[in-house]
A protein has these predicted regions:
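ATP/NTP phosphate-donor binding region
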Residues: 1-64
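Small-residue-rich beta-alpha loop regions that form the catalytic core of phosphotransfer
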Residues: 10-13, 40, 50-98
């Protein structure tokens, strides 16, 4: 099984939620790929220790997409996921949760 995770880097700046999900899924033997659902601003620094994959490439053979963020994040990710009929699980985090 392959799961693609798409975090919103502006909401979860240190990616702690997606890293927790990756850890749990990989312990269960699931292949995971972290992909950004949209391009980030030029001045925004992404963590150098994380490997971000191309969503357009990874979604093609994914079993599910887990989207971390709000409505805008899921709209970006769903544009690509629906082309390949990949189901989407949305996990919403409001400001007080992060």
């Amino acid at each position: 099984m392959k799961i693609v995770l798409t975090p919103n880097p502006y909401r979860d700046r240190n990616f702690k939620h997606v890293e927790q999900a990756v850890s749990i899924l990989q312990q269960s033997g699931v292949e995971t790929k972290i992909c950004l659902p949209f391009d980030v601003d030029r001045n925004f620094e992404l963590p150098g220790d994380m490997n971000f994959c191309d969503l357009n490439k990874e979604i093609k053979n994914a079993d599910i997409l887990i989207c971390f963020g709000g409505d805008g994040t899921i709209l970006h990710a769903s544009k690509i996921a629906t082309r390949y009929h990949v189901p989407i699980l949305k996990l919403f985090f409001d400001e007080c949760f992060i």
